[in-house]
UniProtKB/Swiss-Prot annotation:
Species this chain originates from: Chlamydomonas reinhardtii
Family label: Belongs to the divalent anion:Na+ symporter (DASS) superfamily. Na+/sulfate symporter (TC 2.A.47.4) family.
Function: Na(+)/sulfate cotransporter with a probable low-affinity for sulfate.
Entry protein name: Probable sodium/sulfate cotransporter 3
GO terms under biological process: potassium ion transport
Keyword Cell membrane annotated: yes
Keywords of the record: Cell membrane, Membrane, Repeat, Stress response, Sulfate transport, Symport, Transmembrane, Transmembrane helix, Transport
Length: 896
């Protein structure tokens, strides 16, 4: 092949610069590829002509991707997927079975629906389910993304990349009049994708103990936090060993204060009493979860000081794990004491925290091994990490704050708009005869149960963790807008204001929620919702009201509106546009994903999707395409529109135009690389690998690895589109079937597991689970290596796919069910195996092992030393001081 001329050099340099821009995340791939393609057309057709550059925008594979978003939106709007998944998930108490129950259904679902919608609706379902089952949500969210990706490798419609490759293969070989080579059936990838997915699933199951993060967070670890056992807590009158507190992951009980006496080593047979003070060693978010689950309230330094001074302290003067509405304090923050802080050397008691900073100490992480007593007696030192509650006077921009503190992080933000919203329990609701926790309504991000109004007129406080919900009960909840969307889709519940909503006459098909801020000079100020006759005047119903700094406890109709109040309104989809300039409001905006589910259309939506899939299955079995997936998707979506599964606006918004632009432009860029001979040169390198080793396998492995690496740096769609012409040239020269080439690229393009920004579903769970990049890489890097080995084996033995299927299914079945068989062994054998796996875990992940040792030491020997200052060896050979545990010694009087 001749040397690459100047057009090829320009193309290489241009693509390289674009890769750097996208890898650094300076500009998104949709904009970058579009500009790159336009630039490559500016050389009088020497690199690529305008006509060829524009051809990608009409590619049938790309059009299929776009219109499948309509189908996914239609079935999601009916609420059918949530109902099915809640039923399939069931209940589990172990991480092993939780992963099995959550990953398998998602893998099956994502084989036929786009990954992004699957993960979007599964995140809140999975988080609620995890809380309900007592499993750390962080153990499940990364596997959720991986399961969606793995499931997508099982069919040609499983991912947008698969459809793109199918479209490119069809276009390439039809132009060459090779119709047999152009065909790629719906299940042509299944013989290789299913074993690939199963082995990925097996890896997650085997390594979840060692590599998956638990309830760890990005914030300070090994804090010692004091909590009070609330009178209605389910642990009252239970022995410690029977309470469930000792079995919580990442949570250790290090001491107990009762009746003026401190117990450093708590006997497992100790019976817990109301108002006991428990000293919990762990991370703030772990203690928060356990506190909400078991009915525990947080104790602050201010509470301790008041008690020490002999003052009576009410509940409103302490901080709860969730804003209770009684306290004006809205956020918990984490800060580090600076070296130049004038607070260094002073005790916590000596600092006027509220007056000077608008802050109240909650916990301190120590690292120097000094003996400290009560929280107020701790002598502050540079480098101390503090968890602080904020007051309305807190201002991070003040010079005084900057001098004393650095590394500010908002650990818990309660200042987001929070609405009080009421929901009624329907007669046949699944939550009937369940506690709030068992119903999945406690521990949901942005949602907090305030109280329950019973059907007989009596009221139950939210702190009653034992109350079982009954038909006709009204649950009053504090919820941000995201949680309101979750509530609107929760089966068996309906809004208290539902009657008012129905009276507006707006069809459920065009109903959604809007936020509208009341103008300070508008006509609504000073009037109740009832006096205004809001529904009659605006043809909309107020569902809830948010008032800055104050939780509004009144029923909506009786609230006297004030300027600045934010109204949550159920209305027609065009209401926001019609009232955007209304003098009564200063800000009107729609709440995303707030349309109520059209459950009456659920069966229709599911049947239409099944019908669409069946057209492709039958066509594949008959080796005759009855209808292409693109028009099949459009017709399915059209029927969904006609039957009321979704409306036209929802269909328009469902299309991800950034994906469309990225794929379309990447088609043109790949064509430019082929026209200039660059693709051929790279293909020659792959051909050389194949010829030097021998056989098709090495060449296919090289294609897979190159695509996988590119997928980590770019998007999966871009990686597939860029690599296809290169791989196709190599395949043609090596006489490798076109289907095999496409399979290698499809598998490689989906292999974006290390970088949370490499795949859209990764990014979604990264944000929802509050992961760090390191946590993602800890599981992602070995997972990537494992799948490269698996893919290499599969690609080398493609002709023996039946034997590979039998082997992988057998391995999967063994891994899934062996834990159930192990429970039949004697307890002594089980304990030895547990210890053996613990040693393996320590060898693989020393950081996690260190955290477990600290927790165990705090739980078993917490009373023998108030501060622990020993050092632990780090993996890099250095040492780091262990964290001192600072106990809050409580005086003999009433406690919070």
């Amino acid at each position: 092949m001749a040397a690459i001329g100047w057009p090829g050099i320009v193309a290489i340099i241009s693509v390289a610069i674009s890769f750097i821009i996208m890898a650094a995340d300076w500009v998104g791939p949709d904009i970058t590829f579009t500009i790159l393609l336009s630039w490559l057309t500016a050389f009088d057709g020497k690199i690529i002509t305008v006509a060829k550059a524009a051809a990608g925008y009409g590619n049938t594979g790309l059009l299929t991707v776009i219109f499948l978003y309509w189908v996914a939106e239609g079935v999601t709007q009916t609420g059918g997927l949530e109902l099915v998944m809640n039923y399939v998930l069931g209940r589990s108490r172990s991480v092993h079975w939780a992963l099995v129950r959550s990953m398998f259904p998602v893998m099956v679902l994502s084989a036929f629906l786009n990954n992004t919608p699957c993960v979007t609706f599964m995140i809140p379902i999975l988080m609620s389910w995890a809380r309900r089952c007592g499993v750390p949500p962080k153990k499940l969210l990364i596997p959720l993304s991986y399961a969606a990706v793995l499931g997508g490798t099982c069919t040609s419609i499983g991912t947008s990349t698969n459809l793109v490759i199918v479209g490119m293969q069809d276009t390439r070989y039809n132009k060459q009049n090779k119709e047999d080579e152009a065909k790629f059936g719906m299940f042509d990838i299944a013989p290789y994708g299913v074993p690939y997915a199963l082995m990925g699933f097996v890896f997650i199951i085997l390594t979840q103990r060692f590599l998956l993060p638990g309830n760890s967070s990005r914030y300070a670890k090994d804090l010692l936090i004091a909590v009070r056992v609330l009178p209605s807590s389910p642990v009252v009158k239970k022995k410690l060993k029977d309470s469930g507190l000792r079995t919580q992951t990442g949570f250790s009980l290090a001491g107990l204060w009762r009746g003026g006496a401190m117990t450093r080593q708590v006997d497992p047979d100790t019976v817990l009493e109301a108002n006991d003070i428990l000293y919990c060693a762990g991370e703030l978010d772990v203690v928060e979860f356990v506190g909400e689950e078991f009915g525990l309230g947080l104790v602050t330094a201010e509470t301790e000081r008041a008690l020490t001074d002999g003052q009576a302290v009410g509940d409103s003067e302490a901080t709860a794990f969730h804003d209770t509405g009684a306290s004006p304090y809205k956020k918990l923050v984490q800060v580090t004491m600076t070296k130049t802080a004038d607070l260094v050397g002073r005790t916590v008691r000596e600092v006027s925290w509220q007056g000077r900073f608008g802050l109240i100490p909650v916990a301190i992480q120590r690292g120097n091994g000094r003996e400290d007593g009560r929280l107020n007696d701790v002598v502050l030192a540079a480098g101390d990490v503090l968890i602080l509650d904020t007051t309305p006077h807190f201002d991070e921009a003040r010079d005084d704050f900057k001098i004393n503190f650095e590394k500010l992080r908002f650990v818990k933000d309660g200042a987001a708009k929070e609405f009080v919203i009421g929901v009624k329990v329907k007669k046949n609701s699944e939550v009937v005869n369940k506690t709030v926790t068992a119903a999945g309504l406690r521990g949901v991000p942005g949602l907090f149960v305030l109280s329950v109004d019973r059907a007989d007129g009596s009221s139950v406080d939210a702190s009653d963790y034992l109350y079982k919900i009954q038909p006709g009960d009204t649950l009053w909840l504090a919820a941000d807008v995201g949680a309101v969307g979750f509530l609107s889709k929760f089966p068996g519940l309906e809004l208290v204001q539902q009657e008012q909503v129905d009276k507006t006459g707006t069809s459920i098909l065009y109903r959604h929620l809007v936020q509208a801020a009341v103008s300070h000079k508008g006509p609504l100020v000073g009037k109740t919702v009832r006096d205004v006759r809001f529904r009659t005047l605006y043809n909309a119903a107020i569902v809830a009201v948010h008032r800055e700094g104050v939780r509004v406890p009144l029923k909506v109709q009786d609230i006297v509106l004030q300027g600045g109040d934010v109204l949550l309104i159920s209305c027609h989809t065009k209401w926001a546009e019609e009232h955007r300039m209304d003098k009564a409001f200063v800000l009107v905006q729609a709440v995303p994903d707030s349309s109520p589910p059209k459950r009456g259309r659920m069966a229709i939506g599911v049947l239409l999707v099944v019908g669409m899939v069946l057209t492709q299955i039958v066509g594949g079995l008959k080796e005759k395409e009855y209808i292409h997936l693109w028009p099949a998707a459009v017709l399915t979506a059209a029927l969904m529109l006609l039957t009321g599964c979704m409306n036209a606006d929802q269909a328009r918004k469902a299309i991800m135009w950034d994906v469309y632009l990225t794929i379309a432009a990447a088609f043109g860029v790949s064509a430019a690389l082929e026209n200039t001979g660059v693709a051929g040169k790279v293909a020659n390198a792959i051909i050389s690998i194949g010829k030097s080793i021998g056989g098709d396998g090495p060449a296919l492995i090289a294609i897979y690895v190159a695509t996988a690496v590119m997928s980590e740096l770019l998007t999966n769609n871009a990686a597939g589109a860029i690599m296809y012409p290169i791989a196709a040239i190599a395949g043609d020269q090596l006489k490798i079937p076109a289907v095999d080439i496409s399979v290698a690229i499809m598998l490689g393009a989906s292999a974006g597991f290390i970088n949370p920004f490499s795949y859209q579903t990764n990014l979604m769970v990264y944000a929802a689970g509050n992961y760090s990049v390191r946590e993602f890489a800890t599981i992602g890097a070995p997972f990537q290596i494992w799948l490269m080995v698996v893919a290499s084996f599969i690609l080398c033995y493609m002709k023996q796919w039946k034997q590979v299927w039998i082997a992988t299914w057998s391995i999967t079945a063994f891994i899934v069910f062996v834990p159930a068989l192990l429970t039949l062994l004697p307890h002594t054998v089980q304990n030895r195996m547990e210890a053996f796996f613990d040693r393996i875990a320590e060898a693989i992940n020393p950081r996690a092992a260190l955290q477990r040792r600290r927790s165990a030491r705090a739980q078993s020997f917490g009373g023998k030393a108030m501060s622990v200052g020993s050092t632990e060896s780090r993996t890099d050979g250095s040492s780091t001081p262990d964290v001192a545990l600072t106990f809050i010694e409580m005086p003999k009087m009433g406690v919070r």
